[in-house]
């Protein structure tokens, strides 16, 4: 979600295109089969796991002079592209811990690059760290003197109801950030409840082979 939105924005801002659609999706059963265990295996899920969201989101990014822009209610004012951060996490059932360091690094770098403070944002929203990843993120940023407090939300914690849906640490997957952006974040920007949001989709760079070989899982945001 974040990569497609970033590339679409760069393409439009650079004049290579006037209108670009950024689309992404994920599927629970496909992710389980590919990166964990087939559903038929009925393996027990540790409490640190997240539940891959079955969902999709699409967004149209258009140049100011394009007809689509007349329907726009918000804009992408800037992008901070994160870097790969590897803390040596090897457990594919603990993705929040693998991605949180990358999220912390990108937030810190974004604030440095823009000269802003966390208080300049109505919300800072990460993609799919889950409840455990959120705790790690806040601890890492606190060590740098950055206190998120109640400004931080995570799509993985928003998309499911922890009281009625047992998804353990929360939701995950490309569709998690995309559907939350489309159904939760953008409507609040359109209604004027929020003026500025730092949206930070998170990702893990693993394959179905690498983690089975005991390799670490780098994260990016």
For each predicted feature, which ranges?
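Active-site-proximal alpha-helical scaffold in enzymes
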Residues: 1-22, 59-64, 172-193
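Acidic, glycine-rich active-site loops and adjacent beta-strand->loop/helix elements
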Residues: 24-33, 82-83, 201-206
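Long, repeat-rich segments with strong aromatic
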Residues: 102, 108-140
């Amino acid at each position: 979600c974040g990569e497609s939105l970033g590339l679409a924005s760069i393409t439009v801002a650079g004049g290579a295109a006037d209108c670009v659609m950024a689309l992404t999706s994920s599927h629970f059963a496909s992710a389980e089969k590919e990166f964990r265990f087939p559903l038929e295996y009925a393996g027990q899920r540790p409490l640190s796991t997240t539940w891959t969201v079955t969902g999709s989101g699409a967004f149209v990014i258009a140049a100011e002079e394009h007809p689509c822009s007349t329907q726009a209610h918000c804009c992408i004012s800037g992008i901070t592209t994160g870097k790969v951060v590897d803390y040596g996490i090897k457990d594919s059932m603990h993705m929040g811990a693998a991605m949180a360091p990358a999220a912390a690094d990108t937030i810190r770098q974004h604030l440095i690059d823009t000269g802003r403070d966390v208080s300049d944002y109505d919300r800072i929203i990460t993609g799919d760290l889950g409840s455990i990843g959120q705790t790690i993120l806040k601890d890492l940023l606190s060590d740098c003197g950055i206190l998120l407090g109640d400004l931080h939300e995570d799509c993985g914690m928003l998309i499911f109801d922890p009281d009625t849906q047992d998804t353990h640490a929360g939701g995950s997957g490309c569709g998690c950030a995309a559907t939350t952006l489309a159904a939760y974040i953008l409507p609040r920007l359109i209604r004027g409840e929020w003026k500025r949001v730092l949206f930070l989709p998170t990702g893990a760079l693993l394959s179905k082979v690498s983690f089975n070989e005991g390799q670490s899982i780098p994260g990016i945001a």
